[in-house]
Amino acid sequence: MDLPVTRDGVGPVCLVTGGNGFVGKHLARRLLQLGCEVRTLDLAPFEGDPRVTSYVGDVRKMADVGPACDGVDTVFHTAAIINTLTLARPSVRRLVYGVNVLGTQCVIRACKAKGVKRLVFTSSIAVSVDGPVRGADESWPYAFDASLPDLYSQTKSRAEKLVLDAHEKDGLRTAAVRPGGVWGPGEGAIMVRDFIEHLANGEFKVTIGSSKSVND
């Protein structure tokens, strides 16, 4: 992953929430390569590089997020629960909403309270997709929450709106990145790797839907 950014661009001190997750780990390592001082905030400490300062905590708790944001220039908010269920039991819905939406609110409050200059939010392409889409760009409108198919899409949509609404308020600049499918070295979702291996070996005999559909 070659990010067109520099240490001067993101600032010398960066925090990655969800830093022990797949995207968070790769991002933290890339920031180290840029020469940044890197912190992570996660329920588990960062693994693999002693140069990273790990804050073990919950993004829903200001008492955990606030100290991690002290002296930080840029926060990369990747922490989230990826739950694609539609008919989840109430306790699961509360947990996903709590982490993905209320956790994002907490991160925004902490950024403002601690004077963080920049907040970059990992959103999802799913926030604007409620049917076939061709050639969409940043101007594509949000899908209606009611039409989004799962908890993850619904909560990411609400969280992204919170982040973008906070732009240029209390000295904070914000941005949202909407990746599609994300996979690569170190990914724990074995299904994606198996899918690609089967496809490469010509083992798929049935295609449902258009064979020209892409996820970019």
Residue ranges and their predicted role:
Residues 57-99, 110-113:
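NAD(P)H-binding glycine-rich loop region in Rossmannoid oxidoreductase-like domains
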Residues 147-175:
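Active-site Tyr-X1-5-Lys
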